[in-house]
Structure formats: structure tokens, C-alpha cells
UniProtKB/Swiss-Prot annotation:
PROSITE patterns: NAD_G3PDH (PS00957). This is Glycerol-3-phosphate dehydrogenase [NAD(P)+]. It comes from Leptospira interrogans serogroup Icterohaemorrhagiae serovar copenhageni (strain Fiocruz L1-130). Keywords: Cytoplasm, Lipid biosynthesis, Lipid metabolism, NAD, NADP, Nucleotide-binding, Oxidoreductase, Phospholipid biosynthesis, Phospholipid metabolism. It is found in: Cytoplasm. The gene is gpsA. InterPro entries: 6-PGluconate_DH-like_C_sf (IPR008927), 6PGD_dom2 (IPR013328), G3P_DH_NAD-dep (IPR006168), G3P_DH_NAD-dep_C (IPR006109), G3P_DH_NAD-dep_N (IPR011128), NAD(P)-bd_dom_sf (IPR036291). It catalyses: sn-glycerol 3-phosphate + NAD(+) = dihydroxyacetone phosphate + NADH + H(+); sn-glycerol 3-phosphate + NADP(+) = dihydroxyacetone phosphate + NADPH + H(+). Its main location: cytoplasm. Pathway: Membrane lipid metabolism; glycerophospholipid metabolism. It is an enzyme of class 1 (oxidoreductase). Sn-glycerol 3-phosphate binds at residues 105, 136, 138, 191, 244, 254-256.
Length: 335
């Protein structure tokens, strides 16, 4: 089996490494020559994962046509804000009747489209039943280190979901399939917003009680907006919901938690983002999530406060204080 991976960031590279480790021939699309040369000559992604050796069956190319055309499966892993442009570039080369797996997470700024909505609007209908979405608690470095990991595979088409599940599942990588595309996407996107808040709490020196409170109430917000969009509430108790939320809020490898932590320590957002080599999806997703909650008429207190901190300059300590001063409520999810 020949597989093309679009996106040479840490997660796209990790998925490519997993698939190559299973024995598949994997070609990774990179935008710069030094990265291509480093992967092909030294089996190292010098830009994103310089300390890890990649399998020999993973090669790289700058030629998008070469990466996509004639492949038996396509894995798409660009940042969500770049997804529309990438899909427009690849669709003339995209093979028909092969699985297309998205690992992008986020909600598009301006349009407020989920990743699945971007795929379905940018690609012709003949591709739609072959689309699937991968999400779950999975740091890239730990996948490459072969640490046992579980994720969700969501597709509206059961045949596609089961095929992708079989292709990805391996000794250290277990997948669970679900038809709930919306639930998997909402969980994978909004957990990054909550992780920003958890990072701020840690940066300010608050304890684990506070982090647990943010995770708990964050799951409430994720579930509320998911239900409004038609998701199955049980999805949010699975790998792409609670699993990913816990990892992203607690793990030191989490880029979004790191951004929040540094904000809590007093750095500006501009300083933080300019120093990062990878995209922290939560920053852009916060804006979209805030606008979506306003559009749907859903109260999302944590999301609103993170938005004010990122885009209106609100002091991080005031964010936590105002969350604690909110009107008292009954426990539960109400939409």
C-alpha cells in the first residue's frame, strides 16, 4: 500500500512514521528543500522532530502531485487555517475511491466551518463517502516513541471508517471508529481552547484543584456546543473528547497549554507565538469558538474569558477571578 501524507509538521510526520513502521510506503509532503533532504538522506525531520529517527519507508517530496497521485490512501494534516488552500491545490491530483483521513483540528475563522465542512465544500461529492477524521489523545513524539496510544476514527460511512481503523491500528496504536463526525471534531477543536485556560492557571501558580475545575467545566462547554450542532453526547466521554481534553490540559508537550502557561507568567501573545516552531491551534480556534457560541446563543464562560484575554488584552488573573465570581448554577448540561 502506498500512502501520501499532506503536512510535515510533528503530527503529520508521526502518523507517517506509524504507517511506515507498519510496512506501508509513505511519502510526506514538505514545503522546503532542507526538510526534504534531511528526511530522505538522514531519516530525520530536522524542522519539527530533530531528535527522532524515522523509518526508511517514509520519504519526503516537495512535489504535491507526486505525494498524492496514485496513492491508496491520503492523510491530510495541515493546520486548519491552511486547509482550504491545500485542498484546492491537491484536488486535481486526488485519486478516487481511496480513504482520505483528516488529522486537522480547528474551526475556520470567518466561516466558522468545521474541518469536515471544509472538506465537503472544497472536494466534489464523489469523495465524500471516503472521508474520515482522526482525533484523540496523541502527542506526536510519543507516537514515534511507540508509546501505547488510542484515538477515534470518525466517518459517516462505516466501510470507510472500518478500513481506516484497520490500516492505522498497530501494536502501539489502537483506534476506535464512530459515525459521530461532529462530536469528534468539536472535541478535538475546543479542547485546545480549554487547554489555554488550564495553562494560564498553571502559569499563575494555581493548583490541581483549579486545573480539574477547568477540565470539568470545559467538558461541559464542549458538550453544550456539540449537542447544539447534533453530536452524540457519549462521544465526549471517549478518546476524542475527555481523553484528548485531559492530555492537552495536563501534558507538558501540549502547545496550547504552553501558550497559556507563558501568558500566565506574563509574556505577551505576540512574544509567545513568534518563538514557536509549531502552530497552537487553540489561539485561532478561540476566536471561532467565541463567535460560534454567540451565533448559537450558547453560554461558554471559559471560552469567552479566554477570548477576552487573547483578543481584548484582559489580565489572566482577572480571567480566573471573574470565572469564580459567576452566578451560581445547577450542575449539568443545558443547551
Amino acid at each position: 500500500m502506498k500512502i501520501g501524507v499532506i503536512g510535515s509538521g510533528s503530527f503529520g510526520t508521526a502518523l507517517g512514521s506509524l504507517l511506515a513502521d507498519k510496512g506501508y510506503e509513505v511519502t510526506l509532503w514538505c514545503r522546503n528543500d532542507s526538510q526534504v533532504e534531511s528526511i530522505n538522506r538522514n531519516h530525520i525531520n530536522n524542522k519539527h522532530l530533530p531528535n527522532f529517527t524515522l523509518p526508511e519507508k517514509l520519504t519526503a517530496s516537495k512535489d504535491l502531485r507526486n505525494v498524492v497521485q496514485g496513492k491508496d490512501m491520503i492523510v491530510s494534516s495541515p493546520p486548519s487555517h491552511a486547509l482550504s488552500e491545500v485542498l484546492r491545490e491537491i484536488k486535481e491530483y486526488l485519486p478516487e475511491k481511496v480513504p482520505i483521513v483528516s488529522a486537522s483540528k480547528g474551526i475556520e475563522n470567518g466561516t466558522l466551518r468545521l474541518v469536515s465542512e471544509i472538506f465537503e465544500s472544497e472536494l466534489p461529492e464523489k469523495y465524500h463517502s471516503y472521508l474520515s477524521y482522526l482525533s484523540g489523545p496523541s502527542f506526536a513524539k510519543e507516537i514515534i516513541q511507540k508509546v501505547p496510544t488510542i484515538v477515534s476514527i470518525a466517518s459517516k460511512n462505516e466501510t470507510t471508517a472500518r478500513k481506516v481503523q484497520e490500516i492505522f491500528s498497530f501494536l502501539y496504536f489502537r483506534t476506535y471508529w464512530t459515525p459521530d463526525v461532529i462530536g469528534v471534531e468539536v472535541g478535538g477543536s475546543l479542547k485546545n481552547v480549554i487547554a489555554l485556560a488550564a495553562g494560564v492557571s498553571d502559569g499563575l501558580g494555581f493548583g490541581q484543584n483549579t486545573r480539574a475545575a477547568l477540565i470539568t467545566r470545559g467538558l461541559n462547554e464542549i458538550t453544550k456546543i456539540g449537542l447544539k450542532l447534533g453530536a452524540d453526547p457519549m462521544t465526549f466521554l471517549g478518546p476524542s473528547g475527555m481523553g484528548d481534553l485531559i492530555l492537552t490540559c495536563c501534558g507538558e508537550q501540549s502547545r496550547n497549554r504552553t501558550v497559556g502557561f507563558r501568558l500566565g507568567k506574563g509574556e505577551t501573545l505576540e512574544q509567545i507565538l513568534s518563538s514557536m516552531n509549531e502552530v497552537a491551534e487553540g489561539v485561532k480556534t478561540t476566536q471561532s469558538a467565541y463567535e460560534l457560541s454567540q451565533k448559537l446563543g450558547i453560554e461558554m464562560a471559559i471560552t469567552n474569558e479566554v477570548y477576552k484575554m487573547l483578543y481584548e488584552g484582559k489580565n489572566p488573573r482577572e480571567v480566573v477571578k471573574d470565572l469564580m465570581k459567576r452566578d451560581l448554577k445547577r450542575e449539568g448540561v443545558s443547551v
